[in-house]
């Protein structure tokens, strides 16, 4: 039963990433950690928390914080639905699209680039990753509002 609940959560409650499964593969390959089990619910911004003051660099670089994902939505792109192709060459992510030119390909490439930025930030902040901040977003310490930038 728990497996079904987790899969439902993954499919319907992960609006912060384009193609969750591709994002998961990239995070795992680049950081060695699971996107869902290591980052979802981390701090105040990773996952659906999205409020309060970021607790550390990992949280500050979360895709939920003000990000390129918001720009994608402004251009009528659907980051959750835009699957894309990518390859990892010498540790670097290379985004691709086989659909040819057009809005759909544009959205897919931009979604890939957004994920690329997030994964790169997660990699850079690995030394300061703190296990105590997992599932932290439900804590009252996160507050109710996003900080003003």
From Swiss-Prot:
Signal sequence residues: 1-18
Disulfide partners: 44-142, 77-107, 95-112, 97-105
Subcellular location: Secreted
PROSITE patterns named among the record's database cross-references: PA2_ASP (PS00119)
GO biological process: arachidonate secretion; lipid catabolic process; phosphatidylcholine metabolic process; phosphatidylglycerol metabolic process
PANTHER family: INACTIVE GROUP IIC SECRETORY PHOSPHOLIPASE A2-RELATED, PHOSPHOLIPASE A2 FAMILY MEMBER
The protein, known as: Putative inactive group IIC secretory phospholipase A2
The species this protein was found in: Homo sapiens (Human)
Phylogenetic classification of the source organism: Eukaryota, Metazoa, Chordata, Craniata, Vertebrata
